[in-house]
Amino acid sequence: MAEVTVNELATSIGAPVERLLKQMQEAGLQHKTASAKVSDEEKQRLLAYLKGSHGEAAVEPRKITLQRKTTTTIKTGTGNAKKTVNVEVRKKRTYVKREDDVVDNTQAAQSQEQDDELASTVVEEVQQAEPSVVPVVDVAPEPEPEPVVEEVDVAAEEAEPVEAAVDTSAPTRFSFTDGIEEKRRAAIERRQAEEAARQAELKAIEEAKRAAEEAKRTQPRAEKPADKSAAAGKGAKPDNRQPAKGKQAPVAVPVEREDAKHGHGHKKHHHGRNDDDFDDDSADRGNKRGAGKAVKKAAAPKKSSKIDLLDFVGDDSEDSDVLARRSHIRAHHKKNNKHAFKKPTTQIVHEIDIPETIAVSELAQRLTIKVGELIKRLMKMGVMASMNEQIDQDTAVLIVEELGHKANLVSENDIEHALEKSLETAGELTTRAPVVTVMGHVDHGKTSLLDYIREAKVAAGEAGGITQHIGAYRVTTSRGEITFLDTPGHAAFTAMRARGAKATDVVILVVAADDGVMPQTEEAIMHARAAEVPIVVAINKCDKPSADPDRVTNELVAKGVIPEAYGGDTQFVQVSAHTGQGIDELLEAISLQAEVLELTAVTNAAAKGVVIEARVDKGRGTVATVLVQQGTLKQGDLILAGQSYGRVRAMVNERGEQVKEAGPSTPVEILGLDMPPSAGDDFVVLDDERKAREVAAFRAEKERKEKLARFQAAKLENMFSNMEAGQKKTLTVVIKADVRGSLEAIQASLADIGNDEVQVNVISSGIGGITENDVNLAVTSGAIIVGFNVRADGATRRLAETEGVDIRYYSIIYQLLDEVKAALSGMLDPERVETIVGIANVREVFNSPKFGQVAGCMVVEGTVYRNKPIRVLRDNVVIFTGELESLRRFKDDVNEVRNGFECGIGVKNYDVKVGDQIEVYEVKEVARQL
């Protein structure tokens, strides 16, 4: 709290500035003006001084109780009858520290003189107050000392306001006598006096009533007239005044106050007993115990009586001051004492996230209600579900809105979208090296070309060459670096395309000059086109005598690959892997293509990339080859790749060297993943391991569900379920044949099958057995594989079973065409055909109490069936279409009535007339044929 001035402090506490300055000087503070600053420490000193002056500084206990317990044994009896008895003695003593102990001798002497004067004054007041309770004693049959003592106590109570008034006029111990506190003290004293007077008046009324009842009860036993009873009452008056003359009344006062000090209250009837009770008890008991107590009280010393009385008076005044101060504090803090908690009066609305499916127990937990109550609400909606069953999103939304909460629809892919949004990289873009994939037929020199590039550009001058198993490496040219990916079988490339990742920037298509375009070459062209990646054609083996580059160029033109010399956009380079002819030109063409693409990446950001391949090495664990596309991958980063995650424990480059970080377009091997990721999976760097674990688990569950749903995705019978309504349906096929002639014949025949609604789309065709590449391509495009006189090997069959791809084998071309045509026919919408099965004429109409109007009919054609739809014709015009409600023959329900028989027909929700025709028909769906 900031410092305040003396004037501000006086205003806040409601005291005059002059008195506050005087008190501060008495407390030892050096403040003389109203503008002087007062710190928090000085406020505490002033408060401590004021508390000390008011007698509140000492907070130590003023009463102590000591307890002692001793156990002894005594022997009782004589002779053989002796026995030992344990005797336990318990003693308890209480010591009370008086206020007078802290007063010095001088003040004690002065207080003694004042006490004597006050005692005499109080005794006189007590003697004067005695006549107010005379009617109470007047009805007593026998005067006794005990009632006299109690009457003196009542008079002392009435004299309490006088004592308080006398005490306030005397000099007090407090040095802080503010006008406000004096007014409050006076008000408290006035209220106490009024309360005492009211209690005395009520007590007098009650005593008068009780005396009247006692007089009525004792009147039959009276032996003297009423004046004699009055004389007896007069005779009791001197007895009542006798204890006052002997100054025994002050002895009774501290007895009552001693009870008050021990917690019995300031009111005499606090425990349910009053003076009349004591009078009755003493009258019944006689002069035995009551007289003894009166004698003991009368025998008390005079001086101690006066001291006890003054102690009582001082305590009362001190209690009044304490009450005044407490009331002042309560009034000062009344506004700040409000409870901070407010009971909510409006309904609390929660926002509930609802996924596509949610368990009943989980929804109840989010709604903060009991599961039983939620199940009751579901039953009211017609949904029978237990606490562990899943309900759909729409039902959960209805429940949430019915309870008055807000529902937030959550998609299953929200976690992926949130992850992508949190991984958005922003920074300065820099030029990166191109990523090149070499593809082609295995016999066309692809491996020799890669070996020559590595030996000439990477391993020249290094002992041992490079590590072959990494499958990726970088080459430095005059125009920069180039990253090569070696992906045998192109499995990773297909997986990348399936996930929409463009890990490859340029494809080098290797074609042998002496062999021409082969099926694998066509497959590579289709892969490149599917990924929308530019192609650079490398015509290899140009050093051979049988090389014919022109023939290769013409064959590629026939496949849609147009060279720049023919007006296309594809670069053609003639190379030789043995002599090195055209290698530099090939690298130059790649660099030129990269410049056209303007490849850039962010360097100073979290790393992103793609997994090229993964394996498990003994002693090293999971080893994954990754290609960094964005950012910088560092050792120790937490990466998430598909369903696997972990920290990078080590990184190895293409030379087998340990590296600490890898930038964009850099392939490295990493160690530390918990399981091998799939080839083509994207990887990202995260900061939160818990989030990585959650995303990995979500992806694993999602893949499991997709595999369950994918078993029907590629089946011929369910192919139409994947097509969108209103669009031309397509049957996607991958064809493999034994010879090129058969393949061309099959392609031409399939192209002729189809119409405006369905068609066949051949995405890939080739010669030879069915390979894993074909299966991967079919998985990506949702196609079926057709093999003509070819088969799939064991690994391919296992992959097809795992991915749920349908492979069909044929040896006769007509069977292949018929099944494809049947599949296309199954994709066509069926045709609905109506057939009339029976006609009945209405000849009479009857009224039935159960069915209403019933038509008596004669079946004139076909058969009338009970459960088939009908039409009612009147004058050969259809006036009603519906169904039969009942069909009877001779009061018996029947399912059908044949031609020439009579029957009763009840038409549901319609009235028929005589002469109408009832036409029974059925609707059949007829499959359409191409």
Curated annotation (Swiss-Prot):
Residues 465-469 are annotated as: G2. Residues 263-272, 288-301 have a biased composition (Basic residues). The keyword Nucleotide-binding applies. Residues 208-227 have a biased composition (Basic and acidic residues). Gene3D superfamilies: P-loop containing nucleotide triphosphate hydrolases (3.40.50.300), Putative DNA-binding domain, N-terminal subdomain of bacterial translation initiation factor IF2 (3.30.56.50), Translation factors (2.40.30.10), Translation initiation factor IF- 2, domain 3 (3.40.50.10050). Residues 440-447 are annotated as: G1. GO terms for molecular function: GTP binding; GTPase activity; translation initiation factor activity. Residues 160-179, 208-301 are annotated as: Disordered. Keywords: Cytoplasm, GTP-binding, Initiation factor, Nucleotide-binding, Protein biosynthesis. Pfam families: EF-G_D2, GTP_EFTU, IF-2, IF2_assoc, IF2_N. It is found in: Cytoplasm. Its main location: cytoplasm. Residues 540-543 are annotated as: G4. It comes from the Bacteria. Residues 486-489 are annotated as: G3. GO terms for cellular component: cytosol. Residues 431-600 form the tr-type G domain. Residues 576-578 are annotated as: G5. GTP binds at residues 440-447, 486-490, 540-543. Belongs to the TRAFAC class translation factor GTPase superfamily. Classic translation factor GTPase family. IF-2 subfamily. NCBIfam families: IF-2, small_GTP. One of the essential components for the initiation of protein synthesis. Protects formylmethionyl-tRNA from spontaneous hydrolysis and promotes its binding to the 30S ribosomal subunits. Also involved in the hydrolysis of GTP during the formation of the 70S ribosomal complex. This is Translation initiation factor IF-2. It comes from Cellvibrio japonicus (strain Ueda107).
